[in-house]
Amino acid sequence: MGARETALNALIACRKNGAWSNGALKQLIARDRLDSRDAALAARLCYGVMQNRAKLDFYLRQMLTGKLSGLHPVVRDILHLGLYQLRELDKIPASAAVNESVELARKYCSRQKNAPALVNAVLRTAVRTLGSWQEPTSYADRYSHPEALIALLKQSLPKGQLEPMLIADNTIPPITIQVNTLKTDPQALESALISHGVTCARHRWMTDCLVLTNAGNLEHLEEFRAGLFYVQDPASRLSVQCAGLQEGWQVLDCCAAPGGKSFAACLSMKDTGKIISCDVYPHKAELIAAGAKRLGFDNIVPLCRDATQDRADWTGAFDAVIVDAPCSGLGIIRKKPDIRYKDLAQTEQLPALQENILAVQSRFVRPGGVLMYSTCTVLPRENEQVVARFLEAHPDFYREPLALPEVFPRNESGMLTLIPGQYDTDGFFICRLRRKQ
């Protein structure tokens, strides 16, 4: 089974079962036993089609004699894969893109007798007319974001930031890793990774982070197995850096999976004190435990726990509480492209949940302690507005300025929204709150 078939199965799983593309693709790559080269191609094809679905449909309409809505969903998936290869992957011969697509149609569309012929005809037309296709002009078609999402982002983002975010959402993000400075240093790890053929460089503003390309499956690297690094977006790392954690502190990370913020906290505290890392799902708590063990961290205590539940014996017990709240995820579309297609109505109840979690977790902060609130979305209704309502109901807390790297403007508000494309990060919101003495 090749990369194209794996990518097709991932697209089908996402469409039919509501699976997330990254999870479905990872499982299918393992199931199909793809080597690193085919795994990379499968990922590029799956994410590329996800990122460009509306744009590919725009092209398809120019080549079909019938209506797009009349296509069988799997035929449409196969045509998307073929067109994406022809349009975006110039190293793949056109003949291979066409022929492999026809074979997929024969295998997966046996009940649609004309499917192979249709796929062949459409893609050969595409090859013949390549370079003269009409290009989309609307944001919805050009950047493959639903109209409703574009309208929401337009009213949520600062002026001039909408199109840069849409562009960033369709880029392939680099992999950023945090060096485990308790075991090694950036220079030594960089040299080791380069020796394995990995292209890497220091992150331009985040200390002890490396940016990787051509990395393949990181889990196969000896340095990964030895716990010398873990993957974390610089925005997520920055949120922990802004907490100003000190050695020996008692820290609660209430929505911790997969563990990146707890790991960053451990490095900040040099594996001293204690970090209780919670998640509501047992398998995710186990994931945190496995990561901490691999990295050699001793101060992390994984716990299966619901962040909306109070606990009397934790009242005022922590120097810092980290709340990385469940959110709409609109800041990480570049990593999970299918988020853009989710029903926005399902996100309207999130602010109430976020406020509830923040209120419950605030009880566990000691007088003078720190409460960090973060999300991976750019919507004010899940960010600034949640903080405003929390502070109105909890006058014993106040916002505190953020200490940021020099690349950022001076921050006095205690809140920072990162827009994808601005600082080479995911979209993210960070707020630092302190409890009065």
Locate each region found by the language model.
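S-adenosylmethionine
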Residues: 1-437
